[in-house]
Curated annotation (Swiss-Prot):
Protein name: Uncharacterized protein MJ1065
Annotated AFP-like domain residues: 279-337
Pfam families: NeuB, SAF
Domain of life the protein comes from: Archaea
GO molecular function, one term: N-acylneuraminate-9-phosphate synthase activity
Lineage start: Archaea, Methanobacteriati, Methanobacteriota, Methanomada group, Methanococci
SMART domains: SAF (SM00858)
Similarity annotation: To B.subtilis SpsE.
């Protein structure tokens, strides 16, 4: 299926790029910062704002060195309800990544339009199965995986009732070195799975997501922050509002530039054709009744007369009007055979 519907938006072939501002954990555990992220994402032109939903104790071992960090960034269920309501109020789609099984039910009850699965959970089949059974579209990031693992994950989703799947090419290094971005994998995934494919970006800057649209990405996900200098794990590699807005604008420009793929003269160049192409013209003065030959004709701009591609047709034809040097020769100037 080359096109699916998320909320009121179609995503896939022939549709505008679906742009997700990945708020992630950049709210720093503060609902007010979260709301500001929602507001700024809308102002920047994002189609959706996305967060990460979890209960730390169900997500990370208490013995992990990262437990306290993630605990400090955790938002409550009530706060996610509040963020979703605020997003809907200002007209931007709310999506979240469930990082534990409980949050699948919570987000489904909130009636999120789609589920996002993190790259690290591509092989977490209990989560895939539970999400698939909601019947909601699934956006699946594919960092750290190979085609076999992606194929198996897609089959798990499909076998549990999910029919609307989007794959995101992703490299799970933060930030991703440019030599590892491998944007051509977007084309590989499209050719194998025949479903919408996008790109989840972790590079510095905005070049990679913009280029990925030219390579066929249907969805772009980019980390989004209010300020790159804020404390937290993802702020430094995220796009701030100015950068994100520039990315959105550039993506929309790329969409215009890509066009239909049909090779025809464009409206903006039609007037140029006459001036840029050549006509058959008189090389010297030509008398009425004289035969046209390579000795008395030349090929010059503008292209208002007989096109040069018809040279073989007009050679040895008589001319019925006197022509001065550099006069354009028209079909009406020729006598019959």
């Amino acid at each position: 299926m080359e096109k699916i519907k998320i909320g009121d938006r179609y995503v896939g072939k022939g549709e505008p790029t679906f742009i997700i501002a990945e708020g992630g954990l950049n709210h720093n555990g503060d609902i007010d910062i979260g709301k500001e992220l929602v507001k700024e994402a809308k102002k920047c032109g994002a189609d959706a704002i996305k967060f990460q939903s979890y209960h730390t104790e169900d997500f990370i071992s208490k013995k992990s060195e990262y437990y306290e960090l993630f605990k400090s960034l955790e938002l409550s269920e009530e706060e996610f309800y509040e963020l979703k309501e605020y997003a809907e109020k200002i007209g931007i789609m709310f999506i979240s990544t469930p990082l534990d099984l409980k949050y699948v039910d919570i987000l489904n009850k909130m009636n999120v339009p789609a589920f996002k699965i993190a790259s690290g959970d591509l092989t977490f089949y209990p989560l895939l199965e539970k999400v698939a059974k909601t019947g909601k579209p699934v956006i699946l990031s594919t960092g750290m995986s190979d085609i076999g693992e992606i194929w198996e994950a897609v089959k798990v989703l499909e076998n549990n009732g999910c029919r609307d799947i989007i794959l995101l090419h992703c490299i799970s290094s933060y930030p991703t070195p440019y030599e590892d971005v491998n944007l051509n994998a977007i084309k590989t995934l499209k050719s194998i799975f025949n479903i919408p494919v996008g790109y989840s970006d972790h590079t510095l800057g905005i070049l990679a997501p913009v280029v990925s649209v030219a390579l066929g990405a249907d969805v772009i996900e980019k980390h989004f922050t209010l300020d790159k200098n804020m404390e937290g794990p993802d702020h430094a590699l995220s796009a701030d509002p100015e950068e994100f807005k520039e990315m959105v604008n550039n993506i929309r420009l790329v969409e215009k530039m890509l066009g239909s793929g049909e090779k025809i003269p464009m409206p903006s160049e039609r007037d140029v054709i006459v001036e840029a192409r050549r006509s058959i013209v008189a090389k010297r003065n030509i008398k009425k009744g004289e035969y046209l030959s390579v000795d008395n004709i030349s090929f010059k701009r503008p292209g208002r007369g007989i096109e040069t591609k018809y040279l073989s047709i007009i050679l040895n034809r008589k001319i019925k009007n006197d022509k001065e040097e550099d006069d354009i020769i028209y079909w009406d100037d020729l006598l019959g055979d």
